[in-house]
Amino acid sequence: MSRFILPFIEKVVDVIGNGHCGFQAIAKFMGLTEQSHIMIRTLLIQELKDHINDYVEVFAGEDRCNYILNGLHPHANMEGCAHLVDKWFTVPDMGHIVANYYKMCVIVLTSLEKSESFFPLRRPPPPAKQNTPIICLGVILNHSVLIYLKNGCPLPPSSIEWHNHKKEDALTWEDDYLDQHELFQKPMVIESGNKPPQPQKESNKAAPILLDTPEKPKQII
């Protein structure tokens, strides 16, 4: 995770690294228990199925889309699936699905080049000046944690796939966050040694990020 973002973090909530950490972090954000990760999976499965044609385009083909759909289905042995990489929470893939289902901005903070903001691909944003929650996941050694950010903090650039596939009624989602995107770009260049950031890939098809680690005790930082 980028060092310059640390002063803008209000709180970090860890979850157990047992193969479900990304889904557990979403559950915690929604005020549920970590054990509700199966419900989160179920809701995201329905979102993906209901809009399958849109996601085939976003994920650059049916093969990737089916892989993500299969990965959302929980394994029969929920206690022993930490090693089943295909069942983990992957980004950027899940960023789009979560943003669309919950109708809010999703932030993933990881390396400089791969941190992204995800917005709903359809539906307009809420009325101006209405506070909209932001779901933020941080990636620490391939393990996802829930992050609460301070108001007005820097936010990473919008997903390339969002720009390429957003519907007309979703065009203005980014507008309220442009200043925060700009705040992210300036220190990002400094931290990367004054080198311009590597361009993001045009497709989600290659090199997804997997979010999980072997099981470890839960702690709240």
List each language-model region with its residue ranges.
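Deubiquitinase catalytic domains
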Residues: 84-219
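Papain-like cysteine protease catalytic cores
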Residues: 1-10, 16-119
